[in-house]
A protein has these predicted regions:
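Aromatic (phenylalanine/tyrosine) cluster motif
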Residues: 1-2, 27
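Long, low-complexity, Lys/Arg-enriched
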Residues: 11-97, 109-145
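Elongated alpha-helical scaffolds
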Residues: 102-109
Length: 145
């Protein structure tokens, strides 16, 4: 049992970048062929000096937006951005994870979109600097009590 659990929690070695047409097609095909796999939706590709591979312990990494550089402001016109993120996050399920990276506006809008798609139940990954690892945080926004 321990070995099986350890194997199931091992790093996933595929990374999908939804902003690249071939990678998007590969993701859609892989997701259809592997419906039980979990995915970690990385909202924006992190800078080169930040390693997010530890998040792959929770599922295959799915990067929604490229890294636009440190001086870039992503949202000047909100409608096209909201449409793009609705498209990128449309396959997210309650068992998947969201890795909050990038512009705070990207994070805020994306969490709202994910909440709409999952009826307020979703998982985030939080980085713990002291332990140097990710911890899952489960949300149920409409929970009574």
């Amino acid at each position: 049992y321990y070995i099986r659990c350890q194997e199931n929690n091992r790093m996933k070695n595929k990374i999908f970048e939804l902003y690249k047409p071939k990678s998007l097609a590969d993701f859609l095909s892989f997701k259809e062929e592997n419906p039980k796999e979990n995915f970690v939706y990385v909202l924006q590709h992190p800078p080169a000096n930040i390693n997010i591979l530890g998040a792959s312990d929770f599922g295959y990494l799915v990067i929604c937006l490229p890294n636009f550089g440190p001086d870039s402001q992503i949202i000047f016109s909100s409608s096209p951005f909201v449409f793009k993120m609705q498209k990128n996050l449309r396959d997210v399920r309650q068992q998947d994870y969201i890795l909050l990276t990038g512009d705070p506006a990207v994070i805020g809008i994306s969490c709202a979109i994910v909440s709409d798609y999952t009826s307020g139940k979703f998982n985030l990954l939080k980085w713990d600097r002291r332990e140097a690892k990710y911890y899952p945080i489960n949300f149920d926004l409409y929970q009574k009590g």
